[in-house]
């Protein structure tokens, strides 16, 4: 059985990775524009 804490940890990890991807994407876009 999967614990709720495990699910929370996975969701938090995915959220952090998504945030990092957004930041890197924004930086690359700014480089292309400038």
UniProtKB/Swiss-Prot annotation:
Quick one: where is this thing mainly located?
virion
Coiled-coil annotation reads none
- An example Gene Ontology biological process: symbiont entry into host cell via disruption of host cell envelope
Record's bilayer topology term = Single-pass membrane protein
The portions of this protein that span the membrane are 10-26
Gene Ontology CC, one term = viral inner membrane
Q: What are the alphabetically sorted keywords of the record?
A: Capsid inner membrane protein, Degradation of host cell envelope components during virus entry, Degradation of host peptidoglycans during virus entry, Membrane, Transmembrane, Transmembrane helix, Virion, Virus entry into host cell
Q: Where in the cell is it found?
A: Virion membrane
| Stated role | Exolysin that catalyzes the cleavage of the host peptidoglycans during virus entry.
Output this protein's name: Peptidoglycan hydrolase P7
**What is the originating organism of this protein?**
Pseudoalteromonas phage PM2
């Amino acid at each position: 059985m999967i614990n709720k804490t495990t699910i929370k940890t996975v969701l938090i990890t995915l959220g952090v990775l998504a945030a990092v991807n957004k930041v890197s994407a924004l930086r690359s876009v700014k480089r292309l524009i400038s």
